Structure formats: C-alpha cells, structure tokens
Regions:
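N-terminal basic/disordered segments at the start of proteins
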Residues: 1-52, 262, 273
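Short Fe-S-cluster ligation motifs
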Residues: 185-216, 249-257, 273-289
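Iron-sulfur cluster-binding cysteine motifs and their immediate structural context
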Residues: 214-236, 240-264
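Small-residue-enriched alpha-helical segments and adjacent helix-cap loops
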Residues: 9-14, 36-202, 208-212, 221, ...
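Long insertion/accessory domains within large nucleic-acid-processing enzymes
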Residues: 167-172, 259, 266-267
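A hydrophobic, small-residue-rich beta->alpha segment in the mid-to-C-terminal subdomain
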Residues: 269-312
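Short, flexible, solvent-exposed loop/turn segments with mixed acidic/basic and small polar residues
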Residues: 26-32, 65-71, 225-228
Length: 312
C-alpha cells in the first residue's frame, strides 16, 4: 500500500476522532497527499432524517472527498479523505451547526454502539438507546482523550438476537435478557402447527418448504433440549433455557420474552490474528437496567481500572 497511517493530526482538545493518512508519493499524487479519515459519532440506534444525511454529505462534499462509509465496525459515520487545514473547519461545523460530535479512535473508549432497542423492537429487554447515551455522556473524557493502553468498546444489544453483535465485538457487551419464564400462547402454538400462521414471520415464504414441523424446526434445535411438545402443548424447562431466541424467532406470535427484564454483562470479545476470534465471557449474569445505572457503572469502572494496567 502507498498509504502511511498515523501521524500527529487531529482537532484542538481531542486526542481521537481523526486518523491521519498520508500518501508516500505526494509528488506523484498531490490530490491525496493528505487523506485523513474522520469518525463522526452515530446517533442512537442509527436513526437518521434525510435532511441530516444531506447536511453531512454537503459538508463532506465541500470540505472533504465526498466519500463516506456507513458505518465503520464501531458504528461511526466514516468520512474518508480530507486535508489537515480542513479538520478544524469540519469539526466547527459539525459541533456548532449540526450539534454533532466526533467518535473515538486510537487507544480510547470507542464510540458506544446500540441496536434500535425499544424504539422499534418488541424483543428488547431494556432501553438500549438510553443506556448507550448515558454512558457516552458519562465517559466523554475517556472517549475523546486516549489514556488506555489499547482501545475499549461498549456495545448494547437489546436481546440475545444480538443485532450489533456485541458478544463478538465488544470489550464489555450488554445483552438483554430476562429471568422469568418465556410466555407461551398455546392457541398460537396450535395455529403454527396447523399451518394457520407462517413460521419465522413468513420470511421463508418464497418457496414451498412443506408443512411446519415443530419437532424438527423448534424442539430438536433447542441447544439445551429444554423444550417438549406433547399432547398438543408446548413446555419449556426454564432453568435449562439459555435465551437463545430461536424458538421465539420461529414462532413470534406464540412465544414472548419474560417480564423480569434486564441485561447480562460479558467481557473480552476480540479477534487476535494468531489466536482467532473469541466471544465474550459472561461476567454478570443478570443486572437491572435502571437509571442512574450506578450498578452498571461500578462494574465498568472496576473493569476499566484493570484495563489500564493489563489491556493490550
């Protein structure tokens, strides 16, 4: 590659949010002698208005290359390619005109990322956007001024379907869960078995897969074998259930998440080149997600103190 990464480049007061990129042959390619990347913090749940997106695109067309990436693996809006003199101009317009902040880069807390949560999803076990926003504001210094030995990520999944893949991509993963029984509507179960309701919300209706077989498609695929279907009734052995969501996804009109809701906190997901990808390890099986989130912050700060010494 002809790109030189890094370098001391950024905006005043921030140690992250800008990734310096320089061409190693500026005489041959003067147009991309500087081609810095800027990371812009995404809104909660990635909800946008078309006006907002147009404003960002107009700004980047005017002061950058016009090339964007929606989104980076951390979730940020990625602005690809601008010059050093434009960085402060872009930052000023983002913050003063569009009320928008930069995201994280380098050895800092990366921009927290969440799923749509309770705004749209019936399976969300806690308000992902409220928790994500609260922690983003709480840890502004850690986000904008790198002080860690290595990057650190929060990700928030409202349920175990894990739409932002928190369990695979975060140093602390917040995965929604519940403590009580899955709620079963036996009449709706019978409707699925009888073919009245399409399984999987009708997502596989493009071809004829044959009649729905609850034993084959639900019971036998339960990872802990905690389900049974006998005499027209579905039963679940709750202590053995791992909340994998498969049965709920297949029969969403018959099964619902429980009412005693919160989240599990897991730590340590990473993908080192030599060792290969590693999923998060369960740290806190269940914690209530309630403002002001003091119990959650206590776990975070204990983990953060350890990370300052051991992170790599």
């Amino acid at each position: 590659t002809h790109w030189k990464h890094g370098g001391i480049v950024g905006v005043f007061g921030y140690g992250g949010g800008v990734i310096g990129r320089y061409c190693d042959q500026p005489e041959m390619f003067p147009g991309v002698a500087h081609f810095h990347t800027m990371r812009v913090a995404q809104p909660g749940g990635k909800f946008y208005t078309t006006e907002y997106l147009r404003n960002l695109c107009d700004l980047w067309d005017f002061r950058g290359s016009g090339i964007t990436n929606m989104h980076g693996s951390t979730g940020d809006i990625i602005f690809l390619g601008t010059t050093t003199p434009q960085l402060e101009e872009i930052f000023y317009e983002l913050t003063h005109k569009y009320n928008q902040d930069l995201g994280g880069s380098g050895s800092n807390l990366r921009t927290p990322s969440d799923c749509v949560g309770e705004a749209r999803c019936e399976w969300s076990c806690y308000d992902t956007q409220a928790l994500c926003y609260n922690l983003t504001i709480e840890y502004q210094d850690e986000l904008h001024r790198p002080a860690f030995p290595y990057k650190f990520k929060f990700k928030f999944d409202g349920c175990p379907n894990s739409c932002v893949a928190a369990i695979a991509r975060a140093d602390i993963s917040f995965v929604g869960t519940w403590k009580d029984d899955i709620k079963i509507d036996q009449e709706a179960v019978a409707a699925y078995v009888g073919g009245e309701f399409p399984p999987n919300g009708g997502s596989h209706a493009g071809r004829d897969w044959g009649p729905f077989d609850i034993q084959k498609e639900v019971i036998d695929l339960c990872p802990t074998e905690c389900m049974r279907y006998k005499d027209g009734k579905l039963g679940i052995n709750t202590p053995e259930c791992t909340r994998c969501m498969h049965c709920i996804n297949v029969m969403p009109r018959a099964l619902r998440i429980g009412d005693d809701r919160g989240c599990s906190m897991l730590v340590g997901a990473k993908a080192p080149i030599l060792d290969g990808a590693q999923m998060s390890t369960l740290l806190v099986p269940f914690i209530k997600v309630e403002e002001p989130y003091d119990e959650i912050k206590e776990v975070i700060e204990t983990s953060g103190n350890w990370w300052m010494e051991e992170g790599r």
